């Protein structure tokens, strides 16, 4: 029972650290933001819980820099692929863009 409480507490703290790291990066304190993200990942590895994907996509996997468009990240769309590039280490990640198609034919 104690371990379950600890995991919930540390998961909440990890997500809070990632959000705080984003705010620090916006205020040009990149090194402290990196340390916060490393600490959040350390918690998740140590206590074996997963960080949600929307938080995982907020930082570079190679140098742990929070990714902020125009400051630490460059985004380009090429051939229906979103390319995200970290401006500190050059790490790139590609996401396939899926457009929703609408059927304009109405049944008469």
Curated annotation (Swiss-Prot):
Catalysed reaction, written as an equation: Endonucleolytic cleavage of RNA, removing 5'-extranucleotides from tRNA precursor
Keywords tagged on the record: Cytoplasm, Endonuclease, Hydrolase, Metal-binding, Nuclease, tRNA processing, Zinc
First-tier enzyme category under EC: hydrolase
Cofactors demanded by this protein: Zn(2+)
Binding site for Zn(2+): 60, 63, 86, 89
Disulfide-linked positions: none
UniProt EC number: 3.1.26.5
One cellular-component annotation, GO: cytoplasm
InterPro entries: RNP4 (IPR016432), Rpr2/Snm1/Rpp21 (IPR007175)
Chief site of localization: cytoplasm
Pfam families: Rpr2
Subcellular location per the Swiss-Prot or TrEMBL entry: Cytoplasm
Protein function: Part of ribonuclease P, a protein complex that generates mature tRNA molecules by cleaving their 5'-ends.
Subunit structure: Consists of a catalytic RNA component and at least 4-5 protein subunits.
Protein name: Ribonuclease P protein component 4
Taxonomic classification: Archaea, Thermoproteota, Thermoprotei, Sulfolobales, Sulfolobaceae
Gene: rnp4
